[in-house]
């Protein structure tokens, strides 16, 4: 963090966008429903190219796990997304709490065990623990910052999706035909 005391948020713009969004949602409640989409394609080994809107992303694994290290791992993108989401919500709601944000940083860490996918006894591969360490520099009172962070955390779809079970559906097409998946038994029972 630097010593330069500059509010990184356009407070007036933030208040205007908030008011406009509330007005739109009040008059058209269905406009609050949103779908986001990412499309990914395996290039070679663990190297994957993804597209999210107009943006191109690359993902890979470390050499020790069969990759060529041409990009962050999928889970690194996942936790970076969680950090981006929380900071976006803090920036979005800072004007409502009169919290100038001179500097904000989120350090997100996720702990998990890979044993299960390699046929070893262990947890199911889900994150065991996720920690958001948020560092804020602001001239606002501590109570204002606390309220802002609590609001941002509740408004962060990534944090809420990590907290609550979310139904996941996987659809597979093999050579143009649907291929039903049957989830039975241990992960590696067929290897």
Regions found by a protein language model. Name each.
Residues 1-79, 92-191:
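Extended beta-strand/beta-hairpin segments
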Residues 82-86:
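Alpha-helical metal-binding/catalytic segments enriched in His/Glu/Asp
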């Amino acid at each position: 963090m630097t010593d330069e005391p500059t509010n990184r948020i356009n407070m007036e713009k933030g208040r205007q966008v908030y008011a406009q969004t509330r007005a739109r949602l009040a008059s058209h409640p269905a406009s609050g429903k949103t779908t986001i989409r990412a499309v990914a394609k395996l290039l070679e080994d663990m190297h994957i190219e993804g597209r999210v809107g107009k943006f191109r992303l690359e993902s890979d694994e470390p050499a020790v796990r069969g990759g060529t290290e041409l990009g962050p791992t999928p889970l690194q993108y996942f936790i970076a997304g969680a950090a981006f989401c929380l900071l976006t919500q803090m920036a979005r709601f800072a004007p409502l709490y009169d919290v100038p944000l001179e500097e904000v940083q989120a350090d997100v860490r996720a702990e998990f065990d890979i044993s299960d996918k390699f046929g070893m006894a262990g947890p199911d591969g889900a994150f065991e623990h996720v920690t958001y360490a948020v560092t804020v520099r602001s001239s606002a009172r501590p109570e204002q910052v606390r309220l802002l962070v609590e609001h941002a955390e509740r408004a962060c779809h990534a944090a809420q999706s990590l907290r609550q079970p979310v139904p996941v559906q996987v659809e597979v097409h093999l050579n143009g035909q649907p291929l039903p998946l049957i989830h039975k038994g241990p992960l590696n029972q067929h290897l």
